[in-house]
Amino acid sequence: MEYKYRIADQMLAKKLASKGAILIEGPKWCGKTTTAEQQANSILYMDNPASLETNLQMAEIDASVLLEGDTPRLIDEWQLAPKLWDAIRFEVDHRHDVGQFVLTDSAVPADEKDMHHSGTGRFSWLTMRPMSLYESGESNGKVSLAHLFETPEKIVAINKLKIDDLAYLICRGGWPFACGLQGEAALEQAFDYVDAVIKKDISRVDGVNRNATTTRLLLRSYARNQGSQATIGTIVADMMTNDENEISVKTAGSYLEALRKIFVIEDSEAWNPNLRSKTAIRTANTRYFIDPSIGTAVLGLGPKDLINDLNTMGLFFETLCIRDLRVFADALDGEVYHYRDKNGLECDAVVHLRNGKYGLVEVKLGGDKLINEGAENLLTLAGKINTEKMNDPSFMMVLTGTGDFAYRRKDGVYVVPIGCLKD
């Protein structure tokens, strides 16, 4: 299968030029190893059955032997021998050079008892996610998020994605292997991913045996509460309405933390701007999966189910947009936050860059009525921001699913279909 360009390619190259070792994190099956292979000049596959036992023994006897090879040297599945971490830190210290090692793993963390140093100053971290629509080829990329931060007077782009396309893309997800397949074969990958998480990965995180039925019920409840600031108690209560087996809030919290560690879920933190008047800002995180297909798979939904329930589709579409915005923001040294205050004023995404610039984004599946509502929300929030203490937003955008064009409204709000957006 031909390698597709990843936005992480440029990020990895940048990090290799500034640090001795880079650890690529992210969910399983998101393409970490394949992306690292493109820039590696030598590779050690720790889990190669032909050499696994030898590799593990050598890691115990003299790990430095495993680090020999042209640089950058990729150490894949390094967590199988956690002592490699300290060996790599030592090599980076003594080589006095950048771009020496790239580490990838299967999303299950290493046993830290054999790791005596944090890696601060020697390692850089790179988080990868499933593919954005631009990376998988469904977005034409005619509108750049980076360009929006320059507040252009005019944007023009044509959107080719229709509602049926979006329903399929939500359920397929951004898994690279799925993106190379068609139809039912592509849709099946998310179901396989969820099964692997439930049956194996959630218990491999920290060696704690977790119940598969409880995990599935928890994921279903999480899917029903995505895009909200639901507390763990709310998620548990939702589980109990559909199952007689009780689970405590503490236990549910430990399950969610395990899912967070293996990048199944990735909540959005609250944005706390300077406002003109005192307004209580809700600080609870907003619940999201790292890819919308996880939620549709765990609920047993397909594209036709979403088309028949556009309210539910809207929730999953929001998760897709947050995924893509995070991929794009990473490339711009940015983060994606969420805003909600006590009066119910909400902003689905705040893209905040390291240099202090930020953009406000509302996600709407489509239709003039919803687009107008989104634009009104953005303008209301922008009017509350104390611009004596912080910058005006660089842009306000309604990110849509349907609609034929990307354009700038008379009030300055951009309307951009997700099928036109890139980093």
Locate each region found by the language model:
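Accessory nucleic acid-recognition modules appended to NTPase machines
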Residues: G183-K357
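Conserved catalytic/switch belt of AAA+ P-loop NTPases
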Residues: W85-P109, H117
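Interdomain motor-coupling "hinge/lid" segment immediately C-terminal to the ATP-binding subdomain
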Residues: K113-S228
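Domain-level recognition of nuclease-like catalytic cores that cleave nucleotide substrates
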Residues: G401-D423
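Hydrophobic anchor at the beta1->P-loop junction of P-loop NTPases
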Residues: I24
